[in-house]
Amino acid sequence: MKAKYVFPSDYMADPAANVFDGKLYIYPSHDYDSGECFDDDGGHFQMKDYHVLCIDGDPMEQDAKDCGKQFGIEDIPWVEKQLWDNDCVEKDGKYYLIYSAKDYTGVFHLGVAVADKPEGPFVPEADPIRGSYSIDPCVFKDDDGEIYVYFGGIWGGQLQWYKDNKMLKAEHLPEGKEDPLPSRVARMTGDVKQFAEAPRAVIIVDETGKPLPADDPHRFFEASWMHKYNGKYYFSYSTGDTHLLCYAVGDNPYGPFTYQGVILEPVVGWTTHHSIVEYKGKWYLFHHDCVPSNDTTWLRSLKVAELEYDAEGHIKTVK
């Protein structure tokens, strides 16, 4: 399953691929060299604007087209810096881009921007989503029309500072056989601008129903993604410091999700972030690596590979 670069003319990462109006749209973060030094909290990822990419043909043959800059830090009153991952969903002819960014107190929140077309232009709301925190939103529209946002990331994503949706006085990173820090999920309001409920923990369990422990190399770290296949809910994610993309399967949007296996083995570069989408009868994995930038971890390039399932619905590992 050979992968190809999607947009070789610029550094883009964290691709959220969606199909709207028969076209493939990609909502990435936009890397650039800010001059910041590498640190474990991601201070070297100083992205300052968002672009939308589009493909109307075979993504394994055609490069993506840049639909242009959508908005930047200067357009969002509550944001100081670091426009990180984003995703988009359609409802009633409107398009809602949910993104993560850091406010003037150094805390990450989720924001919403709205457009009349999937390619934009997107206009950001003046305030973040109430009760939101951390990073890496994935917006999932279920078959019944309900919309959910999955989010969360450890270390620079600040998830270790929260418990029961409240900020702690001191961070806590679970170790050993402790329960790991989970992703979060919340159903959205009808206008797709606020949480309709308090975020819940997304629990990943083994085949016996026991949660994966904090020291398991396949536990959640960041980069939540949700898709459905044959009526099942596939929750996929990055393991962060073990550099894998893994997945787990459940029977509803909230889980629990039973761990299944590895989707993508480690790539060149520290981060691994992805999306999975069906387009024109084929399934695709979008992700990124740092080969074109000679392993500069904050200068990443988008890639795509065909994704295959076996007869039992297991995803075949992309090597």
UniProtKB/Swiss-Prot annotation:
Catalytic residues as annotated in Swiss-Prot or TrEMBL: D14, E222
This protein's record includes keyword Hydrolase: yes
Entry EC no(s): 3.2.1.37
Any coiled-coil regions, as ranges: none
MF terms in GO: xylan 1,4-beta-xylosidase activity
Reactions catalysed, as given in the entry: Hydrolysis of (1->4)-beta-D-xylans, to remove successive D-xylose residues from the non-reducing termini
Any single GO BP term: xylan catabolic process
Record-marked site positions (Important for catalytic activity, responsible for pKa modulation of the active site Glu and correct orientation of both the proton donor and substrate): D136
UniProt keyword annotations, A-Z: Carbohydrate metabolism, Glycosidase, Hydrolase, Multifunctional enzyme, Polysaccharide degradation, Xylan degradation
SUPFAM superfamilies cross-referenced by the UniProt entry: Arabinanase/levansucrase/invertase (SSF75005)
Top-level taxonomic group: Bacteria
Protein family membership: Belongs to the glycosyl hydrolase 43 family.
Role played: Exoxylanase capable of acting on certain xylans and xylooligosaccharides.
Name of protein: Beta-xylosidase
Lineage start: Bacteria, Pseudomonadati, Bacteroidota, Bacteroidia, Bacteroidales
Gene, per the UniProt record: xynB
